[in-house]
Amino acid sequence: LGINGKVLRIFDKRTQQKFALKMLQDCPKARREVELHWRASQCPHIVDIVDVYENLYAGRKCLLIVMECLDGGELFSRIQDRGDQAFTEREASEIMKSIGEAIQYLHSINIAHRDVKPENLLYTSKRPNAILKLTDFGFAKETTSHNSLTTPCYTPYYVAPEVLGPEKYDKSCDMWSLGVIMYILLCGYPPFYSNHGLAISPGMKTRIRMGQYEFPNPEWSEVSEEVKMLIRNLLKTEPTQRMTITEFMNHPWIMQSTKVPQTPLHTSRVLKEDKERWEDVKEEMTSALATMRVDYEQIKIKKIEDASNPLLLKRRKKARAVEAAALAH
């Protein structure tokens, strides 16, 4: 039994109805996950918990969480598999509205999800009218004032800048993830990437922390400046400057999604062409998740004055020599 739990497909013998079963080793963390997920599952865009059982498995106490079965697959797989039919800006807007509704509900009841990423966004069925739902509350946390978030648990391509440094972070972490997902929806690739095929390289860390990304053509040539500005407001490196979920939901591109132009996007083609890389990215993210959830206590970033950077030492030495020479004259 893993700490984050394995999900199995099960069915009701009486009705033949399908469900998803998540097994968690019984511990305070697991109970917290179940409690927060249960509280949130009233939202139509969050996977519903049907029942929770305590049991013994291989002699260990465990929790069995019975949830609705989401048969429609992952968000980006669905866009990838759509054939020749172009994915449009209006569809991207409608998808972002659905995800926004889930986050809005969570934030309104003081819960931060902290792991909003495409793999945790699943459709209820393969039908065109299927509902997109947010899953996996393994890293969700209550965000009351006495309990600000201090544990980094993240997936490289969707990790907010403040998770990489020692600053505290809160609901704005989810907003940053929304920005990354929106960016991918509109072009088919992430705004931050590793040049070396590593899950999270030093260069990528720097780009994330500095908020360095572009809107390259041809993929972005037809996307309006208003939409790019919305992404910029979600990807702000300073959490306090980042858009809140209320501001996001009130933005015309989200609020009036039916009026958004049906501009064909490159997303589906790019995702198809990069299918192998996309799978690698997901694998990297999964393995990186296991290794990167470190306690903030272990992250100590030295002040620049105390840093023993050889380049800085060289510069300081040179500066002192220049100063000494000037004084001598």
From Swiss-Prot:
EC number(s) given by UniProt: 2.7.11.1
Transmembrane segments: none
Enzyme class: transferase
PROSITE patterns noted in UniProt: PROTEIN_KINASE_DOM, PROTEIN_KINASE_ST
Cross-linked residues, Glycyl lysine isopeptide (Lys-Gly) (interchain with G-Cter in SUMO): K282
Sequence motif Nuclear export signal (NES), residues: 285-294
Residues covered by region (p38 MAPK-binding site): 295-319
Reaction it catalyzes: L-seryl-[protein] + ATP = O-phospho-L-seryl-[protein] + ADP + H(+); L-threonyl-[protein] + ATP = O-phospho-L-threonyl-[protein] + ADP + H(+)
Cellular component aspect of the GO annotation: cytoplasm; nucleus
Regulation: Activated following phosphorylation by p38-alpha/MAPK14 following various stresses. Inhibited following sumoylation. Specifically inhibited by pyrrolopyridine inhibitors.
Any one GO biological process: response to lipopolysaccharide
The name this protein goes by in its record: MAP kinase-activated protein kinase 2
Gene for this chain: MAPKAPK2
